[in-house]
Amino acid sequence: MLTDTAIRRLESIGQVAKSGKRINGLFRLMESEIVWLEAYARIYANKGAITQGVNQNTLDGFSYERVRTLINQLRDGTYHPKPTRRVFIPKANGKLRPLGLPTGDDKLVQEVVRILLEKIYEPLFSKYSHGFRPRRSTHTALDQIDSTWNGTKWIVNVDIQGFFDNMNHKLLLDLLSKKIEDKRFLNLIGSLLQAGYLEEWKFHGTYSGTPQGGICSPILSNIYLNELDIFLENLAKEFNTGARRRANPLYKHYTHRIRVIRKQVDAGMRDQKTVQEEISALEKVRRPLPSGDPLDPSFKRLHFCRYADDFVIGVIGSKREAEAIMGAVKTFISTTLKLNIAEEKSHIVHASKGTSFLGYTIKTYTGRKIIKTRRGSRHIRMKSVSKQLQLHIPAGRLEKFCTSKKYGNYQKLKARHRTQFLNQSEVEIISAYNAELRGLANYYALATGAKARISKLYRLWQVSLFKTLAAKRKTTVNKVATSLRLDDGGYGIHYQVKGQMRTLRLFRLKTWEQPRVDSSELDVEPNLALFIMTKSELIQRLNANKCEYCETETGPFEVHHVRGLKSIRPGKELWQRIMIARNRKTLILCKRCHQLLTAGKLPPPEALRCR
């Protein structure tokens, strides 16, 4: 398929899907090289790019020739995905999570499939779904709860047991076939699902679920659970009643008395100065009262928010109604989605008690939020009826973080140095410390009183950094602090790069600007031509048809990968120095140079230019 035709086809898929028509021609789109280049451009920089699966096939050595081989294999039916190599990685709770590592070719195929699925389903997904989606994140999920869940009385937690391991393959393919007509494309997804895995070099078949670590797994899980989103949206439409709460009778009584007095003033029956004290007294009595009736049975709402397989439901209503909602959701998950419920982790909690979601504690409190509004020619103040929902940093989270990073004793506020950094440069040490605390602070930026809560950890972090540098310099903490002091009161270190002086500042909580999600930007329609087919610098380099080592223009050309520039030490081979100078993890090489480099026999480029 021609490049322009492929791009136009990709741009139109979303609109066709939204119109309700089934999509065909996806397998033909996979025959376009431009889609494979885009797939490679999206994943080549990932840490796992050169991590091996069940064989030595990685993304290293990517080339047009390799793309054409894969396209031909798909076209003639000889492509068969390899089993993934299963490894186990530690979870936050100390347990292990299985991870499937595909081969390099399978990663490319999966990314192409993922791109096509995203074009079909992204316009169809619910606005309440936030996991593994463009321009959505844990922060957009939490911000949605923070901005729309006020007044929530009950929070329903339903935990799906082993979701990624137990997705029903037949049901998933049936769901896909509702939107996709291309049988060859569906069969390809089926073969990816059933490729199996090797654990300690013993093959295990996969008859359900998607491999965690697979590139397609996140979007396939969203397609599966989109059915749950649709169910909950329909349930909310049935449950939600009342445009607004009825007025609180007592609040209404005092409001009426104030209004009568003001009308008397307007009619000239009473003097404004003489009645002001009486009005102020009535307003003082009215102020603590909610303007609406929090127990109004005619006002009900159901909210929900999902991130991957983790979701919460907020209910404005009675506990009995929350229990009925929970029962309906459990039934749908077990019967329609054919998944199991973890009963011990599923519960209903009063919103004032709080619950955990995406690393935050979500809870309500009875606030004194005053709303200013206009009534006729006057401005009045009303107390909000809603209990204000807040996001909090969970108790013990900061101490746990402190312990894991070995900053010192959190309770006693006693810092210590970190021996693992003593062999690193001071720039590397400060950069590592900055990344740790800035990452934590940015994640909890939505929490109420985030700066105040983090301040204790910040002091411990700073002293730990000073002690680490003091141990490296073999001097005192005070001398380190003095040497790092900047004119504006902050701390930093001066260093040179290519003769130019630079300053690396220490993270400063006082001047830290808490980034907040702008939910309105989520509805902006992207430029699909730019979004889908961005020609990355890497692809431009590959299309230049020139070896970046020997400078030959005789192909074919391949992309050489390294794990990271830190693994390359200056002063060794010329090809390594080239990569450092260009600050790149990739190098475009002709096939001969790449083979010689891999074998450790790459001579100086002058010798190669004579060939």
Task: List where the protein language model places each region.
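Non-catalytic terminal/accessory segments
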Residues: M1-R611
